[in-house]
Amino acid sequence: MSDVEEQYQEEQQPVVQEELQVVELATTIPLDVQEAQREVKLFNKWSFEDVEVKDVSLVDYIQIRNPVFVSHTAGKYASKRFRKAQCPIVERLTNSLMMNGRNNGKKLKAVRIVKHALEIIHVLTEQNPIQVVVDAIVNSGAREDSTRIGSSGTVRRQAVDVSPLRRVNQAIALLTIGAREASFRNIKTIAECLAEELINAAKGSSTSYAIKKKDELERVAKSNR
C-alpha cells in the first residue's frame, strides 16, 4: 500500500466514526419525537395535515396547504392583487383583528389574541382549532348578495352571486367584527369572545354574529331576485 493510500485512509477514518455516532444518536431518539420535529405546527401545537375545506369552491382560497409556525409573513402577500388568497388563513384572521382604529399595527397583540382563542377552542371542543376556524369561515360567507343597478334617476337592487374570494373576505370580517363588538364593555376578553364566535359559526348556530349577518344578506338578495 502506498503512502498516499495510507494517508487517505487515515483522513477518512474520523469521518466514518462521526457518521457512526450520528447514526447511533438517530436510532436512540424515538420515532414519534423525530416525526414531531419534522412536522410544522401552528404555534408548535396544532397540525395542518388533517384540516380539510368542506366547500369545494373555497379550496383554492382558504390556504392551509403551506403550514407555518407563526401567523406572520411580514406582508409578502400584499404586494400584488389577489395574492392574499395565498396567505395562510390564520394569518388573515389575525390581520383582520387589527382593522379597528386603536388596534392598527398591533400585530403581536393580535397574534396573542388568536393563539389564546385557539387554545380555548381546543379545550372546549377537543378538536383541532384550525379545522374549527376553517369551518367557521366556510359557514359565514354569504353565497348571494344584492347590488345597486341603474343611474341616479332609477335605481334598483339586483341579486348577484358572490365570488369565492369575497366570500372568504366577508366571512373573516364578520367574524372579527362580531368578536370585537361582543367584547366591548364586557367582562369577557376578546380572545374568549373570538373563540365563542368561531365555535358558534362552525356549528352554524344563529347566536353567531357572522351567521346572523350572512342570513340577513341572503334574505335581502332573495327578495331582490
From Swiss-Prot:
It comes from the Eukaryota. Its main location: cytoplasm. GO terms for molecular function: mRNA binding; rRNA binding; structural constituent of ribosome. Keywords: Cytoplasm, Ribonucleoprotein, Ribosomal protein. Belongs to the universal ribosomal protein uS7 family. Component of the small ribosomal subunit. Mature ribosomes consist of a small (40S) and a large (60S) subunit. The 40S subunit contains about 32 different proteins and 1 molecule of RNA (18S). The 60S subunit contains 45 different proteins and 3 molecules of RNA (25S, 5.8S and 5S). NCBIfam families: PRK04027.1, uS7_euk_arch. Component of the ribosome, a large ribonucleoprotein complex responsible for the synthesis of proteins in the cell. The small ribosomal subunit (SSU) binds messenger RNAs (mRNAs) and translates the encoded message by selecting cognate aminoacyl-transfer RNA (tRNA) molecules. The large subunit (LSU) contains the ribosomal catalytic site termed the peptidyl transferase center (PTC), which catalyzes the formation of peptide bonds, thereby polymerizing the amino acids delivered by tRNAs into a polypeptide chain. This is Small ribosomal subunit protein uS7. The gene is RPS5.
